[in-house]
Amino acid sequence: NNDLVEMLTFAKPDIIAMTGDIIDSNNTDLDIALHFAEEAVKIAPCYYITGNHEAWVSENIYSEFEDNLIEMGISVLHNEKVLLEREEAKISLIGIDDPDFFERATLGGIQGAIIETKLSPLLDNRNYNIVLCHRPEFFDNYAALGAELVLTGHAHGGQFRLPVIGGLIAPNQG
């Protein structure tokens, strides 16, 4: 995480989007995730959405994690939007919870429908819509509803990670 924090500091982003799976349900160590979050929020405003790993830990562990994020000043978006403004530009930043928080469905059609139900009322055609949603495999759903930019997680290694050709595509994940 120190390298990531250093890269973020150098990049000077306007915002930092955390798109879930910041904790690992198989090896839950909140301190690692919270240390990263604590450093990230010093760099830029941070917006966080849940991933499937957050849904898979106990409710007590997740509640403790989220409470800590909020105390640090991180905006946790649960199927809601915030308006970002700069000069004349308005951006709707929309955060959708991972569908595993709603239903332990494994069929893509069911999860896609859950996401559409949560996302549709939040999109605003007067603004540029940036959607934070954990699941890249539902990109077609997001685009069909009117999302102009979608930032996702879930791929654990990223769909982008180029230097010496890492990442780019994760099978069955968008």
Task: List PLM regions with ranges.
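Extracytoplasmic/secreted cell-surface and envelope-processing proteins
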Residues: 26-27, 57-59, 86, 140-142, ...
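Binuclear metal-dependent hydrolase catalytic cores centered on His/Asp/Glu-rich metal-binding motifs
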Residues: 63, 67-74, 86-129, 139-140
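Membrane-embedded segments
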Residues: 1-77
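Active-site metal-binding loops of divalent metal-dependent hydrolases
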Residues: 20-22, 52-54, 80-81, 96-99, ...
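Short acidic, glycine-rich surface-loop motifs adjacent to enzyme active sites
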Residues: 15, 19, 23, 126-138
